Amino acid sequence: MIVNFTARHTELTEDIRDYCEKRLKRMGKILDEVQQIEVILTEEKSRKRAELLVKRAGEDFALSEETTDMFNSLNKVFDSLERKIVKERRK
C-alpha cells in the first residue's frame, strides 16, 4: 500500500506522520485490498481538516473530518475509514 502525505497551509510534522502510519499499520488486515491512501491535511484559521483519499480495486472514495485539533481530525477520519471498510466487508 502506498501512502502519500499532503499539507496545505500547515506543517507536516514527524509526530503527525508517525501517528498516521501507526494507525494505518494497526488496521493492516482490513486494508489488504487498498492500493493507495492519500492523507491531506489542511488548516484554515482555527479549523483543522483531515482528508483521506482511498484507492482500491474497483472503487475510490474520500473521507473527511474537521475539528479544532489536527490529531482529533485524524483520529475521527481513521475511525470513519475503519467503520466503512468493516461495514462493506460484512455485506
Tell where the protein language model's regions lie, with residue ranges.
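N-terminal, polar/charged subdomain of small-to-medium soluble alpha/beta proteins
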Residues: M1-K91
